[in-house]
C-alpha cells in the first residue's frame, strides 16, 4: 500500500454505490426514472474510475505470500453483472463460463466488463478446452485490446465466471482446482459464481466472488470476497435497452377488447341480416308456388319489420299484413281473406281476393258498411313500430325515415319497382359495409396479437434460454 499514498481503498468503496450484491434487485423502470437524478453521481464515479484506470502501469503488490487472504473486495459494474446474469439464464440447467475484464487496485478487484466463452458444460461441471483458450486469446486481441485502447483504457483478464444453476454460489472441488491453477500462473485472479434459478425465483441477483488459498494442512480451500455493484460509463448500453422495448400490456389489452367488441357486433349484424334473407327466400319460394310474383329486396325490408315486430309485440294487438287485398282487410291473420269465417254475398268472388264489379245501386249500402267497419278496425289496431332505424345511419333503414316513409296504407311493394331497386342497392351497400368492417377489425386484432407476440418473443430471447 506504500506505492499508493493518494488512494485509499476504503475511500474508494465509500464513494461508489455501497450496497451488497445479494440485496441488489434488477428494476429497469426504477433505473429509467433515476437516470437524470444520478447523472451527477455517475460523473463523479467516472472520474474516480478513470483514476483507477490511470494506475495501469503500476503493478499491484503481491502480498498473497505474506497473507493468503489479502484480496477482500470486488467492485462489479452493473453492465458486467447484467451480462453475467443474462448469459447464465440463457444456459438454463447447463453450466456456462466466461471471462472477467478489469483492473486490480490494492486489495480490490474492479471489474468493468466480461465476455462469454464457448465451452462444453453439463448440469454440474464446465471446463474450458484448448479451443476455448484459443478463442479467448483471439477475442481479447481483436475485440478488447483494440476497443479499449482507442478510449485510452486498459482492461485485462483478471478472472472468470461460471454458473451454478439451482445449487447456490460456492466453489466445487473442480472449481477450486481451476482457480488455484490460475492463481499460481496469472495472479491476481478472481472466480465469480452466479445462480440463475435462485436469482429468478427470489427476484434478486444471487452472485458471489471467490478465491482459493492453502490452509495449514496444505489443503485447498476458498473464501468469499465482499462484492459491490457500481455504476459506470459502460452502462450507457443498458439505458436505451429499457426504453426501446416498452411492453404496454394494459394498453394492448384495452385496444384488443375494444376491437374485439366491435368485431362481435359486426358478426351479430351479419347474422341477423342472413336470418332475414333466409326468411325472405323461404317466403319467396312459397309465394312462387301460389303464382305470386314478389320482389326480394322489398320483402327483405318488410321481413325485417315483421321479424322485429313479432319479437317485441308480446301478444298485445294483432299485426296488420302489409300484403293485403283491396277487398277485405285481414286483421290477425296471415292470409288475405278468411274464407271460413266470412259469409260471402252474391257480389263477392270466392276464387279471387278482388271484388267483382257490381251494380252500384245494389251494392252501395253493403260496401259502405264494410268499408266503415274496416276503417274502424285499422284505426284501433296498433301501429307497426319502426325497427330498422336501430342501425343508426344504416344504408337501407334510412329509406323509411321521415318523409321517405310511404304513408299510403294501401302501398303495394310489388308495384314499386323504382323503390325496390333503391332498396336493393341499399342492401348491397350494407352488405359490403359489414364485410369491410369485419375485415378491418380482424386485421387490427391480428396486428395487435403479432405485436404482443414479437414483444414476448424478444423478452424470452433476452431473459431466458
Curated annotation (Swiss-Prot):
Keyword Hydrolase found: yes
The record's region (Disordered) falls at 364-386
Against InterPro entries, the record matches this protein to: JAMM/MPN+_dom, JAMM_MPN+_peptidase_M67A, MPN
One example of the protein's molecular function in GO is: metalloendopeptidase activity
Residue intervals of the MPN domain: 74-216
Question: What's one Pfam family the UniProt record gives for this protein?
Answer: JAB
What EC number(s) does its UniProt record assign?
A: 3.4.-.-
Q: Which UniProt keywords apply?
A: Cytoplasm, Hydrolase, Metal-binding, Metalloprotease, Nucleus, Protease, Signalosome, Zinc
Print the domain comment field. Answer: The JAMM motif is essential for the protease activity of the CSN complex resulting in deneddylation of cullins. It constitutes the catalytic center of the complex.
Main role? Answer: Catalytic Component of the COP9 signalosome (CSN) complex that acts as an regulator of the ubiquitin (Ubl) conjugation pathway by mediating the deneddylation of the cullin subunit of SCF-type E3 ubiquitin-protein ligase complexes.
Name of the protein in question:
COP9 signalosome complex subunit 5
Q: Which organism is it from?
A: Candida glabrata (strain ATCC 2001 / BCRC 20586 / JCM 3761 / NBRC 0622 / NRRL Y-65 / CBS 138)
